[in-house]
UniProtKB/Swiss-Prot annotation:
GO terms for molecular function: large ribosomal subunit rRNA binding; structural constituent of ribosome. This is Large ribosomal subunit protein uL10. The lineage of its organism: Archaea, Thermoproteota, Thermoprotei, Sulfolobales, Sulfolobaceae. Keywords: Ribonucleoprotein, Ribosomal protein, RNA-binding, rRNA-binding. Residues 309-325 have a biased composition (Basic and acidic residues). Part of the 50S ribosomal subunit. Forms part of the ribosomal stalk which helps the ribosome interact with GTP-bound translation factors. Forms a heptameric L10(L12)2(L12)2(L12)2 complex, where L10 forms an elongated spine to which the L12 dimers bind in a sequential fashion. SUPFAM superfamilies: Ribosomal protein L10-like. HAMAP family: Ribosomal_uL10_arch. Pfam families: Ribosomal_L10, RL10P_insert. It comes from the Archaea.
Amino acid sequence: MKRLALALKQRKVASWKLEEVKELTELIKNSNTILIGNLEGFPADKLHEIRKKLRGKATIKVTKNTLFKIAAKNAGIDIEKLEQYLTGPNVFIFTKDNPFITNMFFENYKLRRYAMPGDKAEEEVVIPAGDTGMPAGPILSVFGKLKVQTKVQDGKVHVVKDTVVAKPGDVIPAEALPILQKLGIMPVYVKLKIKVAYHEGLVIPAESLKLDLEGYRSNITEAYRNAFTLAVEIAYPTPDVLKFTISKVFKNAIALASEIGYITPESAQAVISKAVAKAYALATAIGGKVDLGVQLPTVQQSQSQQPAAEEKKEEKKEEEKKGPSEEEIASGLASLFG
């Protein structure tokens, strides 16, 4: 009798459910990552678009939570870890890819749908100028309520100029919904919200799946800049650093040579320019007290002092600019990461 009761019980299980569990079990075993997404309020036709987009990269299944639980147990997954996420209508995404990269796709991949009552505009909702294709009639009063200027031409309603019917954050007027649909305007964005990812035994909640790529990039750039500045300061011998270090040392050497009057082919011009500037300055200082017997070229003096001042400014700028440029940072990061 027990065997008969068991056989009758087994017959009550629909064959499609057995096939579904079998397929799910194989998908779980052959996937490195499983993501569970919330299907509540998500349009079915948009899910079809996602399937097409992820073809070859992931398998998307809409199934009952109970069947997934059975399949997960069959595949050796501790279902208790996922129990809290298996409520309401869900979609299951099976992939071999990294869970963070896959979640990033869903974060960035937004789809449009027609507006429904109560929807808020994420951007300006505009009824464009031109032929609406709608026959003149009661619809004119609807356009009037929306303050959209119209005219009737060849029995059709024409919008005179582009008109904003909702600004970002505004509830889209109910009167505008049928018009927007007839014009094929989809002002609302939707995206599939991921609840959790299961990756090789690790449960990763949705809030932990989000990556701040701009923040990471900024941190790496800042770290590279600081490291480069320190390397230049201590003359750390690497090809990228030495290029800046040698230039800095050369300028310091020229500045020192011009200060002490040490003449070399490289420093001669700087030494002579500095000496001439000092001579003019001294002559100017004592010219009022002693007749030097020469006429001081005051214009030349100011001109000769100006390059020296500009040279000092340039040297000061070079001293302040201890870090590499944006192009050099990008080049360095490229070589760092291959």
